[in-house]
């Protein structure tokens, strides 16, 4: 039964990472400059999950295999007075869609809650087993 706890815990860690990436996307939704002031619109990130837990050498559970950068099209906004505008007056903004990020956050939350429920069920089973053995 402790394996079940490990599996659910790996999912909690993975979903927490996913939610952190989503929060970064939302926070950078309008960021068009790098930290040093150079023009480079932020690009949305997303988490790629993989089965297993390489830290434990287990084929069960889940882990974050990588955090990828979405190479999708940036969002052009007409701002002819901006120093970052192209020849046609457009400034490219991040490819972050607030609605998509909100749905992804909700999905991560539901997955997190489901794994908490699995942990609670496992703890209950362990408790009953200990009562029987005691």
What are these regions (language model features)?
Residues 1-134:
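Amphipathic alpha-helical polymerization modules
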């Amino acid at each position: 039964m402790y394996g079940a706890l490990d599996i659910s815990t790996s999912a909690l860690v993975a979903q927490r990472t996913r939610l952190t990436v989503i929060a970064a996307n939302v926070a950078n939704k309008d960021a068009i400059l790098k930290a040093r002031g150079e023009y480079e619109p932020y690009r949305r990130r997303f988490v790629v999950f993989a089965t297993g837990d390489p830290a434990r050498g287990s084929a069960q559970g889940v882990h974050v295999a990588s955090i990828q950068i979405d190479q999708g099209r940036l969002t052009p906004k007409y701002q002819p007075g901006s120093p970052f505008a192209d020849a046609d007056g457009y400034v490219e903004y991040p490819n972050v869609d607030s609605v998509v990020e909100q749905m992804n956050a909700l999905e991560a939350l539901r997955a997190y809650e489901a794994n908490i429920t699995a942990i609670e069920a496992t703890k209950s089973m362990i408790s009953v087993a200990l009562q029987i053995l005691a």
